[in-house]
């Protein structure tokens, strides 16, 4: 009896093991395959989208760049550092230069006609040592020399106008005149003389007046006589070079010039 029970138990164990081995070999039903794949792929897609959404939210915006400040015009302090003290700007120096050009042209023309230098025309004593000259005259010479070399300080700057180039300058537009055909500006000055050029010519005139006065104080001769140019003649017999200088300085003084003055305060 006991042997039969052991044999039946062993047979049951063997049968259970064989059934467990056969189950994995069985094919999976088609319905289970069809229904299980979309759910897994859908879950993966949803999980990927969720990660993508959370990933976008974590991105940081790039910091905005600050606008770079515009470069300021350099302030010229001069020899004595008086740029911020007396407020001598390039615009003031341009005015002084225009006055110097008019004065220099008038003194040359007057000496060519009368034969007298600029000091002799004003009935001032000449032909004396420089230290015996009038104090006001010496101050004028010193001020003119310092202004001519820019020692008083010249704040600000002259900015030239943008030149017109291309077809707008090469072709005569309808309604324009003869100046456009020659390449000249229609509404501006004729010679295109800028304020920066006029400032340079004004400094030359200041130097010319200062040295001609110094020479006349010491020698008693005017600017033309110091250069051995004939003076005291009618205007139609004056040297052509002298007349050219007179006309040049006169036109340069009254010419408005192109460009504009920009100060340090405007730039700030």
UniProtKB/Swiss-Prot annotation:
GO annotation terms (biological process): nonphotochemical quenching; photosynthesis; response to high light intensity
GO cellular component terms listed in the entry, alphabetical order: chloroplast thylakoid membrane; photosystem II
Spans through the membrane: 99-119, 133-153, 199-219, 234-254
Signal peptide segment: none
Any Pfam family the entry gives: Chloroa_b-bind
Keywords: Chloroplast, Membrane, Photosynthesis, Photosystem II, Plastid, Repeat, Thylakoid, Transit peptide, Transmembrane, Transmembrane helix
UniProt induction comment: By high light.
Mutant phenotype after disruption: Impaired energy-dependent nonphotochemical quenching (NPQ, qE) in high light conditions leading to an increased susceptibility to photoinhibition. Reduced seeds production. Reduced photosynthetic CO(2) assimilation in high light intensity. Accumulation of superoxide and hydrogen peroxide in chloroplasts. Accelerated cyclic electron flow (CEF) due to an alternate PGR5-dependent CEF pathway conferring a photoprotection of photosystems in the absence of energy-dependent quenching (qE).
Highest taxon, organism lineage: Eukaryota
UniProt keyword Transmembrane helix, yes or no: yes
Name by which UniProt lists this protein: Photosystem II 22 kDa protein 1, chloroplastic
Topology of this chain in the membrane: Multi-pass membrane protein
């Amino acid at each position: 009896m006991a042997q039969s029970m052991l044999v039946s138990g062993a047979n049951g164990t063997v049968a259970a093991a064989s059934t467990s081995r056969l189950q994995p070999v069985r094919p999976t039903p088609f319905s289970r395959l069809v229904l299980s794949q979309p759910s897994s792929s859908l879950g993966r897609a949803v999980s990927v989208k969720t990660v993508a959404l959370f990933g976008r939210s974590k991105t940081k915006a790039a910091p905005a760049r600050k606008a770079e400040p515009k470069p300021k015009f350099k302030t010229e302090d001069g020899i004595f550092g008086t740029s911020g003290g007396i407020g001598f700007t390039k615009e003031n120096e341009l005015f002084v230069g225009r006055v110097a050009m008019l004065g220099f042209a008038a003194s040359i023309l007057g000496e060519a006609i009368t034969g007298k230098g600029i000091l002799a025309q004003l009935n001032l004593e000449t032909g004396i040592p420089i230290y015996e000259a009038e104090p006001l005259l010496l101050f004028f010479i010193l001020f003119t020399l310092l202004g001519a070399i820019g020692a008083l300080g010249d704040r600000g700057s002259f900015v030239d106008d943008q030149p017109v180039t291309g077809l707008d300058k090469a072709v005569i537009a309808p309604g324009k005149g003869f100046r456009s055909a020659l390449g000249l500006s229609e509404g501006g000055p004729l010679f295109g003389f800028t304020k920066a050029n006029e400032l340079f010519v004004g400094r030359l005139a200041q130097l010319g007046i200062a040295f001609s006065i110094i020479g006349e104080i010491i020698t008693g001769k005017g600017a033309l006589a110091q250069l051995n140019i004939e003076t005291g003649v009618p205007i139609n017999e004056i040297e052509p070079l002298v007349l050219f200088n007179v006309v040049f300085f006169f036109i340069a003084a009254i010419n408005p010039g192109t460009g504009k003055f920009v100060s340090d305060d405007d730039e700030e």
